[in-house]
C-alpha cells in the first residue's frame, strides 16, 4: 500500500492560499482547496498547465464553505465541490465531509490521507472599531478565529485516528502538521488604528496555536503559526484603510513586506522540516 499525503488549504482561491497550493502541488502533495463560494472554487488555485505537469498520483479538488456562517456550516449534509483532472474537464461533486475526497481517491494500491492543514482564510477590517457593526465583527471573528479553530480540531481528530488506524504511516512522510496563518498585527507592539478587531482575531489565533502545539506534541502532531507583515497583492493590502496601511508600512518598513510565494515557501519549510525530525 502506498500512503499519499494530502493538504487542506483554506482561503486557497487567491492570494497567499493560492500560492501555498501551488507550492504544495509542485512538491508532490495532493490538495483539497477550500473557498467561500461555489463561484470562487471554480477559479481553481492551480492553473491547468501546472495540473497537467503534476505526477500521476496527484489529485486536486475544491470545496465551498462559507466560514462566516460558523457554526452552521458544520451541520450541512453536503458541500458543493469540484474535482480537477489532468486530461478532462472539471467535474462538479458533492462531498459529505472534508475527508470524503481522500476516500474517493483511495483504492487497493493507494491510500490518500490528510496530513497537513493550512488555515489561510482571512477577513480584514475596513474601518475603526467604533464604525464596525456587530455583524462585521462577528464575520471577522468567525472567519479569522472560530472557523480555523474548528477546522484545526476536526483535522486533528482525523490525524490521530489515522495514526491509530495505519501505524505504518510513521516514517512514511512528514509528521501531521497544522499551520495557521496569523498576522504581524497579532503582536501587542503593533497598534495600528483601523485594525483593532482584525488584530484581536489574529492574536487569538496565534495564542491558540501556541498552546495547541504543547497539547499536540505528545500526540506527534506539529502546530505552527506564521505571522506575515504586508503581503503584496492580498485582500489585506487592498482593503486596509489608507491611514492604517501607511502607518503599517512606516512601522514595519520594507523588510516587513513579502510576496505570497515567500509565505508558501515558509509553509513548505515547516512541513518538510517535520519529516527530517521524524
UniProtKB/Swiss-Prot annotation:
Give the chief site where it resides.
mitochondrion
Keyword Mitochondrion, does the record have it? yes
User: Matching Pfam families, A to Z?
Assistant: adh_short
| Catalytic residues, chain numbering | 182 (proton donor), 198 (proton acceptor), 202 (lowers pka of active site tyr)
Residue sites binding NADP(+) per the record: 13-14, 16, 36, 40, 44, 66-67, 77, 122, 125-126, 198, 202, 230-231
Q: In which pathway does it act?
A: Lipid metabolism; fatty acid biosynthesis
Q: Describe the reaction catalysed, as an equation.
A: a (3R)-hydroxyacyl-[ACP] + NADP(+) = a 3-oxoacyl-[ACP] + NADPH + H(+)
Subcellular localization is given as: Mitochondrion
User: Its domain of life?
Assistant: Eukaryota
Q: What does the sequence similarity comment in the record state about its family?
A: Belongs to the short-chain dehydrogenases/reductases (SDR) family.
The name under which this protein is listed is 3-oxoacyl-[acyl-carrier-protein] reductase
Look up and give the organism this protein is from: Saccharomyces cerevisiae (strain ATCC 204508 / S288c) (Baker's yeast)
Write the gene name: OAR1
Amino acid at each position: 500500500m502506498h500512503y499519499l499525503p494530502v493538504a487542506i488549504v483554506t482561503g486557497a482561491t487567491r492570494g497567499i492560499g493560492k500560492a501555498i497550493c501551488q507550492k504544495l502541488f509542485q512538491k508532490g502533495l495532493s490538495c483539497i482547496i477550500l473557498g467561500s463560494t461555489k463561484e470562487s472554487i471554480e477559479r481553481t488555485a492551480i492553473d491547468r498547465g501546472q495540473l497537467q505537469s503534476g505526477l500521476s498520483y496527484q489529485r486536486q479538488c475544491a470545496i465551498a464553505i462559507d466560514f462566516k456562517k460558523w457554526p452552521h456550516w458544520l451541520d450541512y449534509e453536503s458541500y458543493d465541490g469540484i474535482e480537477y483532472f489532468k486530461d478532462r474537464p472539471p467535474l462538479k461533486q458533492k462531498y459529505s465531509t472534508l475527508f470524503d475526497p481522500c476516500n474517493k481517491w483511495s483504492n487497493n494500491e493507494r491510500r490518500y490521507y490528510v496530513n497537513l492543514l493550512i488555515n489561510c482564510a482571512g477577513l480584514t477590517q475596513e474601518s475603526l472599531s467604533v464604525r464596525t457593526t456587530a455583524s462585521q465583527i462577528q464575520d471577522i471573528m468567525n472567519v479569522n478565529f472560530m472557523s480555523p479553530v474548528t477546522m484545526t480540531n476536526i483535522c486533528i481528530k482525523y490525524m490521530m485516528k489515522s495514526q491509530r488506524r495505519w501505524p505504518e504511516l510513521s516514517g512514511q512522510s512528514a509528521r501531521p502538521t497544522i499551520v495557521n496563518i496569523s498576522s504581524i498585527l497579532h503582536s501587542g507592539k503593533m497598534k495600528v488604528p483601523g485594525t483593532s478587531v482584525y488584530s484581536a482575531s489574529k492574536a487569538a489565533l496565534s495564542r491558540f496555536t501556541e498552546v495547541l502545539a504543547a497539547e499536540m506534541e505528545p500526540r506527534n502532531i506539529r502546530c505552527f503559526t506564521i505571522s506575515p507583515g504586508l503581503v503584496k497583492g492580498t485582500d489585506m493590502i487592498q482593503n486596509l484603510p489608507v491611514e492604517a496601511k501607511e502607518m503599517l508600512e512606516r512601522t514595519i518598513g520594507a523588510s516587513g513586506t513579502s510576496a505570497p510565494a515567500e509565505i508558501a515557501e515558509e509553509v513548505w519549510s515547516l512541513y518538510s522540516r517535520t519529516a527530517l525530525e521524524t
